[in-house]
């Protein structure tokens, strides 16, 4: 039978081996991941106020 705990331990051991191979410390890993996330989502969070100025508000008709 497949044991999920053994699988999780195996993945954790593989990650530790990879981190030791590339000499990545756990406290540096947080900085690396956050910088990657910032670079990926930078285009999504960029605000273009010039495009917003050209829009006109919507008129709502109530019955």
UniProtKB/Swiss-Prot annotation:
Changing residue 58 to A: Decreases down-regulation of protein expression of newly transcribed genes in the host cell. Complete loss of RAE1 binding. Disrupts bidirectional nucleocytoplasmic transport by interacting with host RAE1-NUP98 complex. Disrupts cell nuclear import complex formation also by tethering karyopherin alpha 2 and karyopherin beta 1 to the membrane. Retention of import factors at the ER/Golgi membrane leads to a loss of transport into the nucleus. Thereby prevents STAT1 nuclear translocation in response to interferon signaling, thus blocking the expression of interferon stimulated genes (ISGs) that display multiple antiviral activities. GO terms for biological process: symbiont-mediated suppression of host innate immune response; symbiont-mediated suppression of host JAK-STAT cascade via inhibition of STAT1 activity; symbiont-mediated suppression of host type I interferon-mediated signaling pathway. Residues 54-63 are annotated as: Critical for disrupting nuclear import. It is found in: Host endoplasmic reticulum membrane; Host Golgi apparatus membrane; Host cytoplasm. Belongs to the coronaviruses accessory protein 6 family. Its main location: host cell. May interact with nsp8. Interacts with protein ORF9b. Interacts with host RAE1 in NUP98-RAE1 complex; the interaction disrupts the host nuclear import. Interacts with host KPNA2. Keywords: Host cytoplasm, Host endoplasmic reticulum, Host Golgi apparatus, Host membrane, Host-virus interaction, Inhibition of host innate immune response by virus, Inhibition of host interferon signaling pathway by virus, Inhibition of host STAT1 by virus, Interferon antiviral system evasion, Membrane, Viral immunoevasion, Virulence. This is ORF6 protein. It comes from the Viruses. GO terms for cellular component: host cell endoplasmic reticulum membrane; host cell Golgi membrane; membrane. InterPro entries: NS6_bCoV.
């Amino acid at each position: 039978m497949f044991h999920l705990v053994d699988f999780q331990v195996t993945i954790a051991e593989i990650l530790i081996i990879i981190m030791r191979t590339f000499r990545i410390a756990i406290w540096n890993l947080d900085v690396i991941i956050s910088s990657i996330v910032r670079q990926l989502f930078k285009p999504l969070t960029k605000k273009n106020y010039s495009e917003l100025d050209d829009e006109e508000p919507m008129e709502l008709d109530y019955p």
